[in-house]
Amino acid sequence: MSPPSQLCLLTIVALILPSEGQTPEKPRSSFTAHQSSVTTHVPVPDQTSPGVQTTPPIWTSEAGEATGSQTAAKTKTQQLTEMATANPVTDPGPLTSSEKGTPALSRIKSPSPPKGYMPPSYIENPLDPNENSPFYYDNTTLRKRGLLVAAVLFITGIIILTSGKCRQFSQLCLNRHR
């Protein structure tokens, strides 16, 4: 194996394998199951389907009495139900909560923000005090810059190998063996 191909192979292996300190302590996945958060996708039918009805969330309470917060929550639920009748959706089934007096709809979370999104508070107040240092880089920044440098070196190597002088040098080597 020639030295340039060894260098390319070493660069690719170094970029693929995580370096020391970059291995996650817990395996990360894009889907995390949490019992208290449920995302339900409900298809919205067109206005031509006549049998579609909406149902308000089912409330659970031990004594059957509504407290002040439950009454306020029921009022909000009734307002939401009135708004939902203008835009009917299919019934996903009865939604009940294991907690006292809370609707199951409160457990539904909104979709997560995009991958590169950072809230403004994180940008203004970094979590690590070393982040203010000009010599501190997080792992993702180092990996991105490393990939950029590797790509530039790879393309530069290809340009050098395919330039006229390298072709002349290889012809000189071939002529020497004759």
UniProtKB/Swiss-Prot annotation:
UniProt record, GO biological process: positive regulation of sodium ion export across plasma membrane; potassium ion transport; sodium ion transport
Signal sequence coordinates: 1-21
UniProt GO MF annotations: actin binding; cadherin binding; ion channel regulator activity; potassium channel regulator activity; sodium channel regulator activity
Tissue specificity field: Spleen, lung, skeletal muscle, and testis.
Stretches with biased composition (Low complexity): 70-79
Post-translational modification: Glycosylated.
Keywords: Cell membrane, Ion transport, Membrane, Potassium, Potassium transport, Signal, Sodium, Sodium transport, Sodium/potassium transport, Transmembrane, Transmembrane helix, Transport
First-listed, main subcellular location of the protein, grouped into a coarse class: membrane
Subcellular location: Cell membrane; Basolateral cell membrane
UniProt topological domain (Cytoplasmic) ranges: 165-178
Region of interest (Disordered), residue spans: 21-126
GO cellular component, one term: plasma membrane
A Pfam cross-reference name: ATP1G1_PLM_MAT8
CDD domains named in the record: FXYD_FXYD5 (cd20323)
UniProt key word Transport: yes
PROSITE patterns listed in its UniProt record: FXYD
Extracellular topological intervals: 22-146
Role according to the record: Associates with and regulates the activity of the sodium/potassium-transporting ATPase (NKA) which catalyzes the hydrolysis of ATP coupled with the exchange of Na(+) and K(+) ions across the plasma membrane. May increase NKA activity by increasing the apparent affinity for Na(+). Involved in down-regulation of E-cadherin which results in reduced cell adhesion. Promotes metastasis.
Protein name: FXYD domain-containing ion transport regulator 5
Species the sequence originates in: Rattus norvegicus (Rat)
